[in-house]
Amino acid sequence: MNLREKYHIPNDSVITIAGTVGVGKSTMTRALAQALDFKTSFEKVDTNPYLEKFYDDFERWSFHLQVYFLAERFKEQKKIFEYGGGFVQDRSIYEDTGIFAKMHFDKGTMSPTDYETYTNLFDAMVMTPYFPHPDLLIYLEGSFDEIISRIQERGRDMEKSTPISYWEEMYNRYTNWIDNFNACPILRINISDYDLMQEENPIEQIIEKVGRSLQHSRRYTRRELAR
C-alpha cells in the first residue's frame, strides 16, 4: 500500500504549496508529488516576456507582469483540472494579488487605476464558484531567521544582493495574507518541525496531515451541498 492509499488521499486531489521566498516550496512540491505519485506544476519563468523589462522599470511594467502571471496561472489551473487532478502545484494563484500586486500598489509602482483593474480582473476570473480552486493549500512557514538562512544557503545571485529589509517586508506580508486567507482549505506546516532538507524522511508525517485535512474539507463540502 502506498502513502496515498494509506492516508486515503483521492487520486484527483489538487494540492498547492504557498509561502514566502526561500521557505522550501519547490522542495515540498517535489517530495509530495513523488510520495503521492502525483504530477508537478511549476511556475514558468523562462518564457515570461515581461520579467526582464520589469526589473529594469517596476513602475512601467508591474501591471503587465501581474496580468501575464494571472493569465498563465489561470490556464495552468484549468489544465490541471481538465487533466483530472493528481497534481502538486508550486505557488498559488492567490499570492499574485494578495502579495505581489498589493505590494506594488502600496509602494507606488502600480497606479491606483491599474491596481483596481487588476484586482477586478482577478476577482472575476478566480474568486467565483466556477474557478477550480485547489482541494488544499499547504502554507509553509517558519521564523524569519530560518528563512533568511535558507535564502543565503541556496546562493542565488539576485537574492543575495537583495536587501534584508525586502525579505522582511515580504515575510510580514505573507504572514498577514495567510491569516486572512479563506479561498480554499489550508494546512499550515512549520519548516522547523518538518525539514525535508535535514530529516531522513518526514514526508509521511506531512502526508498523514494532508490526508486528514482533505477528508475534513471534503466532508464539510458534502454537508454544505446537502443543505
Language-model region placement:
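Extreme N-terminal, non-catalytic leader segments
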Residues: M1-S13
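Conserved substrate/cofactor phosphate-moiety recognition/catalytic segment
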Residues: Q34-R73, I99
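P-loop (Walker A) phosphate-binding loop of NTP-binding proteins
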Residues: T20
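NTP-dependent small-molecule kinase module
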Residues: E5, I148-R227
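Conserved lysine of the Walker
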Residues: K25
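A glycine- and Lys/Arg-enriched "phosphate-lid" helix/loop adjacent to the NTP-binding pocket
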Residues: I99-R173
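Hydrophobic anchor at the beta1->P-loop junction of P-loop NTPases
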Residues: I17
